[in-house]
């Protein structure tokens, strides 16, 4: 009875040791050896001067191959004063009649306009 328990415990310990060894070997193969070389990989053909071409030395600073996502990725540039406006500020919403006061109704290009100086018309509907 004790021999049977001893065999089960030994098989369990052997299984744990084999699984640890396999997982350790797997992670060591997948890990990058030197992180500095990963960040400074050079583009093809710019690895440095060759011993044959000593007279044609070109000083080119290599760029990193890796792309690092930063906080400014995809953001637009700041406001430019020369940019064209979608809605020109100089023209009023209700056309050229400046005696009207118009309010947006919630429907695209539909405004409710009222006269500013107390004229006889109560409400007019305008489409801009």
UniProtKB/Swiss-Prot annotation:
Keyword annotations: Amidation, Cleavage on pair of basic residues, Neuropeptide, Secreted, Signal
Any one of the GO CC terms: extracellular region
Taxonomy, superkingdom: Eukaryota
Protein's cellular compartments: Secreted
Prodomain residues: 26-29, 47-63, 77-128
Signal peptide: 1-23
Stretches of the chain forming a coiled coil according to its record: none
Keyword Signal carried by entry: yes
Tyrosine amide: residues carrying this PTM: 44, 73
GO biological process, one term: neuropeptide signaling pathway
Main function: Neuropeptides RYamide-1 and RYamide-2 are ligands for the G-protein coupled receptor RYa-R. RYamide-2 is the most potent activator of RYa-R.
Protein name: RYamide neuropeptides
Organism: Tribolium castaneum (Red flour beetle)
Organism classification: Eukaryota, Metazoa, Ecdysozoa, Arthropoda, Hexapoda
Gene that encodes it: RYa
């Amino acid at each position: 009875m004790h021999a049977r328990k001893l065999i089960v415990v030994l098989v369990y310990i052997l299984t744990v040791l084999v699984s640890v060894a396999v997982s350790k070997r797997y992670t060591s193969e997948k890990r990058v050896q030197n992180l500095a070389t990963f960040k400074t990989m050079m583009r093809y053909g710019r690895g440095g001067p060759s011993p044959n071409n000593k007279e044609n030395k070109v000083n080119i600073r290599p760029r990193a191959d890796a792309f690092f996502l930063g906080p400014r990725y995809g953001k637009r540039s700041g406001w430019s004063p020369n940019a064209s406006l979608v809605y020109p500020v100089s023209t009023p919403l209700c056309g050229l009649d400046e005696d009207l006061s118009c309010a947006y109704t919630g429907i695209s290009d539909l405004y409710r306009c009222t006269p500013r100086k107390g004229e006889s018309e109560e409400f007019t509907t305008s489409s801009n």
